[in-house]
Amino acid sequence: MASKFFIVHHTFKPGMVEKWWDNMKNYDETKQKIHLDNQTEAGVYCHTFMPTAKEGPMFCIWEAKEGVSDSEFQNFIDGPNAIGVHMDLDHPLNNHCQKIDHDLIGGEGPFPRRF
């Protein structure tokens, strides 16, 4: 079995739009490294972040290594190591995670596999 990909649909919780974007200005190399280290430890990786408008929604393509269950992935996205936490925000996003059916796209993911 190989890694799997997810598309994550993010929407802002009430009152979080301005706080999110203000804090993104402070998302420096140190915070990025912490977030990437947490991803590595959890066996997940965000390939791309795609905001559609300042007010949202935002979409991301994530990869989870073999052995990471769907619920473990959702728990990471919603949990204490989510990006918003490292921006000094308390869980600013609602996150709908949808696994991509690799069989429908020829067995490969939308990006070259990291795992």
Residue ranges and their predicted role:
Residues 1-57, 63-75, 93-115:
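Short S/T/G/P-rich N-terminal loop/turn motif that feeds into the first structured element of a domain
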Residues 78-88:
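A common structural junction motif
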